[in-house]
Amino acid sequence: MTISIVLINYNVRFFIEQCLSSVKKAIESSAMLRDKAEVIVVDNASADGSMDFLPPLFPGFRFVGNSENTGFARACNQGLRLCRGEFILFLNPDTLLAEDSLETCIRAFGPHTGAVGVRMVDGSGRVLRESKRGFPGTAASFFRLTGMTGLFPKSAYFSAYYRGELNENENHEIDILSGAFMLVRKSVLDITGGFDERFFMYAEDIDLSWRIRQAGFQNLYLAKTSIIHFKGESTNRDARYAFHFHEAMELFRHKYFRHHSAFVGFLIRSAIRFRELKARFNGPSRRNTHSHPVRRFWLSGDAGSGAECRKKLLEKNFMPAESETDAELIIYCEGPQCSWKSIIQLIESAPVKQPHYFHGAGTHSLIGSAFSDARGEVIEI
């Protein structure tokens, strides 16, 4: 078995449906991986009918249902124990892969490579800064938590957390990879162990990335393949987010910074508290909203998939727009004539960044997210 892909689902059945559809295409498109890949989905007690909805759609994938939400790290380790692959991919359910993403990443491994991550863009095509990160030392953490990184995004000092000085279009050896797409050699995980299960949510990817580095392996940011990561769907930035974020940062501080001076500890704790209060003050995550009683749509991509999508939208009283600029919903339809890779390239190269919606051939929904800190929207069709 070449690769095992582990996903954790929690009440995002339509987002993970689109994700699994793209994973299936990536496996089937690769001679290297066809019949040499396995997909394991651990469901953390979803209440949205995921475990009834998903298994019939993906009969070749393995679904494991938990009776309670055990947290991301523990569920990942649960999936890891079932893996038989030489490479393990930890993948978020709110992602869409290009058809060549898996093979490209596997081929990028050198003898000293421990893990590989990719260039990630949101649903509007904007590059996500967390695609490449440095170790969150004292100064880097403080500047990130207080928002200074946003003021100086290209600074090697103020934006050290996101390695802002590195060209996002080039490959780099980095400290920290994103858990949204983290491909790790299984033999490396045998040395480092999996995720630290004390992290219920957040920072577990930072911790594992750093342990891979400490074990003497390289973490590689690979710029030549891109994926979509909606991000907001798995990061609900409300009071609950603030609690788990604060909990994770306190654990991380204790694990890596407990020997620092009292003043340094005070700075880090203050920055964490500032971030928590900011999240609480901002309130619940924004939801994608629409301004027209009847929503106008514009379809691009595969003709066959688009025709089926158009039929379903008309049945739901959506209206076709006269032009793309007149549309409230710009929908990219994947299919034989338009791959996920070409769709990702289109939104990356678009001169104007705006929200898009996505539909995989044969799936039952459209998904999209207007903001990286907003919960996504699902239109069931």
Positions of predicted regions on the chain:
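Active-site-adjacent helix/loop segment of glycosyltransferases
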Residues: 210-286
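Short aromatic/hydrophobic "clamp" motif used to bind/position activated sugar donors
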Residues: 88
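A conserved acidic beta->alpha catalytic loop
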Residues: 22, 43-52, 68
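Short, flexible, basic/aromatic active-site loop/helix in glycosyltransferases
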Residues: 135-174
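A short, conserved alpha-helix in the catalytic core of glycosyltransferases
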Residues: 167-170, 175-225, 347
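Short, well-formed alpha-helical segments that are part of the catalytic scaffolds
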Residues: 7, 12-31, 307-314
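Conserved donor NDP-sugar-binding/catalytic core segment of glycosyltransferases
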Residues: 96-130
